[in-house]
C-alpha cells in the first residue's frame, strides 16, 4: 500500500475572498462546489491537476494570526525570478505581501510570501528542486 496525498481541506472565515485569492494569485480554478456547512464547499485545483491534488475550501474557520517569522505555508513553484517579483508586486498592491522577495541558499531558492484572506501564508518560489523544471535540479 502506498498512500497518495490528494487534497488539503481548509475552514476559512471568508469563503469568497479565499476563492478569489487562489484564483488570482495561484491560477487555481473551481472544479466543484456544492451546498454544505451552511454555505457551500468549494474544490479548487491547478489546471491539469484536477485528479491529483486539490484544495477543499469550506466556511467556518478562524483567521490565522501567524507571526511574520512563522514559515508555515503552502508552496507554489514558478518558472522564473521575474515571476516571483511579479507576484510580489501584485501582492504589495493588494496589501497581502508578508515576505519580500529574497534569495536563500539551495534548496530554498528565490521566493516571496503572501497572506491569504484566512491568514495562511502562501510561498511562490523559483529554484527549488520541486515543481516545473525541477527534474534537472538534484535533490539536496
Residue ranges of model-derived segments:
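Short, charged/polar, Gly/Pro-enriched secondary-structure boundary elements
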Residues: 49-55, 118-121
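Short beta-strand/turn micro-motifs at beta-sheet edges
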Residues: 58-64
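Hydrophobic pocket/interface hotspot
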Residues: 18, 22, 84, 91
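Vicinal oxygen chelate
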Residues: 4-13, 45, 64-140
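Core segments of cupin and vicinal oxygen chelate
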Residues: 2, 9-52
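N-terminal beta-strand motif that seeds the catalytic metal site of vicinal oxygen chelate
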Residues: 1-16, 73-74, 129-140
Amino acid at each position: 500500500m502506498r498512500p497518495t496525498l490528494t487534497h488539503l481541506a481548509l475552514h476559512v472565515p471568508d469563503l469568497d475572498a479565499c476563492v478569489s485569492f487562489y484564483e488570482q494569485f495561484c491560477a487555481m480554478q473551481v472544479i466543484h462546489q456544492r451546498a454544505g456547512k451552511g454555505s457551500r464547499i468549494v474544490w479548487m485545483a491547478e489546471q491539469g491537476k484536477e485528479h491529483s491534488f486539490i484544495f477543499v475550501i469550506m466556511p467556518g474557520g478562524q483567521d490565522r494570526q501567524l507571526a511574520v517569522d512563522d514559515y508555515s505555508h503552502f508552496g507554489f513553484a514558478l518558472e522564473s525570478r521575474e515571476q516571483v517579483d511579479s507576484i510580489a508586486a501584485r501582492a504589495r498592491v493588494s496589501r497581502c505581501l508578508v515576505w519580500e522577495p529574497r534569495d536563500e541558499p539551495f534548496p530554498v531558492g528565490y521566493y516571496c510570501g503572501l497572506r491569504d484572506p484566512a491568514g495562511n501564508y502562501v510561498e511562490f518560489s523559483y529554484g527549488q528542486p520541486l515543481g516545473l523544471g525541477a527534474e534537472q535540479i538534484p535533490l539536496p
